[in-house]
């Protein structure tokens, strides 16, 4: 099974994305936040969400799992849940977990505070509490005999990794994401937020992957076999 991850769309469609999804026979698309942007003035920001996701599902026949970013306005989760056809609706994974084939996806959107006063900012201590609770819930109820890949989907990247690195060398990620990754070691963390930080890194045994801004033309491809063995790579759309 192939899963593609993208992030930071900011209201800009990509024909290359749909072409790639169809060509590579992708089963699911993960969206790590900032589908739209509260600063958009040419159209109502939330009006972008449903047509964007509908086209992806209808053209490429993929399941869509998405979370809010810090730039997504209030109402983003409802907009995500109202997207996709009735037989294949999109899922808003904010503060949720779901089993999908031999994968468990756990999601938490928004970001730690930024200098820009964006609508989806969350105190880092609160991020830690929520992400910890999600991972602890799966750790408690999960069947350890089942071969599954755990994917933590966050908008904010874990602090002090390649995924949170600004061009000037400053790390601006979330300790609230990094600490529970250290404690529970999910297999993969897909994140976004830092547009220039397209990268693959590790926190302990957890692979941390940031696809960067969609407009830059990259994504993360996760390939999982029936024994839950997997690879993670950066791909060009």
Task: Spell out what each predicted region is.
Residues 13-100:
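Core catalytic region of metal-dependent phosphoesterases/phosphodiesterases
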Residues 5-8, 29-34, 64-70, 91-94, ...:
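Active-site neighborhood of phospho(di)ester-bond hydrolases with catalytic His/Asp-centered motifs
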Residues 5-11, 40-45, 165-169, 186:
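Short, flexible loop segments at the rims of nucleotide/cofactor-binding pockets, characterized by
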Residues 1-4, 97-107, 145-151, 202-207, ...:
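Beta-strand-turn-beta hairpins that frame and shape the catalytic cleft
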Residues 72-172:
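Conserved catalytic scaffold of divalent metal-dependent phosphoesterases
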Residues 160, 165-226:
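Conserved beta-sheet core of the metallophosphoesterase superfamily
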Residues 232-237:
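Short, solvent-exposed aromatic-acidic interface loops
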Residues 22-24, 54-61, 144-146, 181-184, ...:
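Short, conserved loop/helix-junction motifs that constitute active-site signature segments
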């Amino acid at each position: 099974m192939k899963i593609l991850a993208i992030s930071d769309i900011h209201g800009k469609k990509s024909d290359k994305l749909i072409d790639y999804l169809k060509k590579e026979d992708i089963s699911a698309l993960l969206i790590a936040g900032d589908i739209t942007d509260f600063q958009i003035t040419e159209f109502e920001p939330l009006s972008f969400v449903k047509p964007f996701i509908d086209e992806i599902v209808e053209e490429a026949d993929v399941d869509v799992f998405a979370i809010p970013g810090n730039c997504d306005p209030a109402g983003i989760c409802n907009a995500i849940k109202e997207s996709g056809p009735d037989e294949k609706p999109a899922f808003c994974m904010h503060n949720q977990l779901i089993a999908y084939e031999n994968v468990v996806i756990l999601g938490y959107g928004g970001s730690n505070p930024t200098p820009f006063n964006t609508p989806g900012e969350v105190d880092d201590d609160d991020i830690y509490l929520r992400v910890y609770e999600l991972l602890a819930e799966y750790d408690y109820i999960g069947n350890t005999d089942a071969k599954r890949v755990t994917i933590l989907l966050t908008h904010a990247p874990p602090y002090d990794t390649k995924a949170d690195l600004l061009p000037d060398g400053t790390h601006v990620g979330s300790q609230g994401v990094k600490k529970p990754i250290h404690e529970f070691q999910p297999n993969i963390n897909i994140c976004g937020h830092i547009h220039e930080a397209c990268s693959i890194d590790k926190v302990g045994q957890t692979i941390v992957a940031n696809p960067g801004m969609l407009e830059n033309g990259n994504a993360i491809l996760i390939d999982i076999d029936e024994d839950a063995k997997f690879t993670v790579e950066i791909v060009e759309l």
